[in-house]
Amino acid sequence: MAGLAMNTELLRRILVGFIREEVRKIGLQKAVLGLSGGIDSALVAYLAAEALGPENVYACTMPYRTSNPESEAHARLVAERLGINYRVIEITPMVDAYFQMVPDADNMRRGNKMARERMTILYDHSAAYSALVLGTSNKTELLLGYGTLFGDMASALNPIGDIYKTQVWQLSEAMGVPREVIEKKPSADLWAGQTDEQELGFTYREVDELLYQMVDLRCNRQELIAQGFSADFIDKIYGKVQNSHFKRRLPVIAKVSTRTIDRDFRYSRDWGK
């Protein structure tokens, strides 16, 4: 795991500076995020509070009736330690109103609906407080497509999108995220008893090492096998990365003009300012 070890103090300064500068570029001073009680959102809350000041950070916990009460307790713990603005908004009435019309929906559809309901709440708070929405998906999740398009993957700014889950743990330790949050099993908490690693079928530490070699170091299949990764595992992960690529792109626009958005018409976020 040597390749995944990071200089946490340097990483902290980079990400804090990134949040501060990108929010400033938009002409704003505040940020809003979903605080789930998990380690990813907790880390983003810590980074945002340092970058913008706790008074400029708005966190929402949005439980559903099947959510683990521990999740809300951990989210509240993080918010209270940081002194950020905090609110709990129950999404059960909105979600259940829809599923009364489609009662046969499976867990995946229900989970996606919950994630998108939370996204609409965050963007409403963004409008209410003139605050930029911060993403909380890490690099592992983004590469695997382990998230809901236009749900938890939706944000204006993602400070941790280029660090693997293993590195999220490292930086969280260094920044003093509560032990209860760091040590619990990762879970999207979309249905009772759900855990990320059980659903994925492998551990984050296993897949992070493979993804690092595959993506960052550009090792080919034979090189990965020579390092001890099984061919089945390599093929499974490569398939997940390839099949979820559409989640990492803007909607594809049919090109019919000389300058097409996101192809020939590309400018930095602070263009013209």
UniProtKB/Swiss-Prot annotation:
It catalyses: deamido-NAD(+) + NH4(+) + ATP = AMP + diphosphate + NAD(+) + H(+). SUPFAM superfamilies: Adenine nucleotide alpha hydrolases-like. GO terms for biological process: NAD biosynthetic process. Its EC number is 6.3.1.5. Keywords: ATP-binding, Ligase, Magnesium, Metal-binding, NAD, Nucleotide-binding. The keyword Zinc does not apply. Mg(2+) binds at residues 40, 141. The keyword Iron does not apply. GO terms for molecular function: ATP binding; glutaminase activity; metal ion binding; NAD+ synthase (glutamine-hydrolyzing) activity; NAD+ synthase activity. Pathway: Cofactor biosynthesis; NAD(+) biosynthesis; NAD(+) from deamido-NAD(+) (ammonia route): step 1/1. InterPro entries: NAD/GMP_synthase, NAD_synthase, NH(3)-dep_NAD(+)_synth, Rossmann-like_a/b/a_fold. One of its GO terms (cellular component) is cytoplasm. Deamido-NAD(+) binds at residue 116. ATP binds at residues 34-41, 136, 165, 187. Belongs to the NAD synthetase family. Catalyzes the ATP-dependent amidation of deamido-NAD to form NAD. Uses ammonia as a nitrogen source. Homodimer. This is NH(3)-dependent NAD(+) synthetase. It comes from Geotalea uraniireducens (strain Rf4). The gene is nadE.
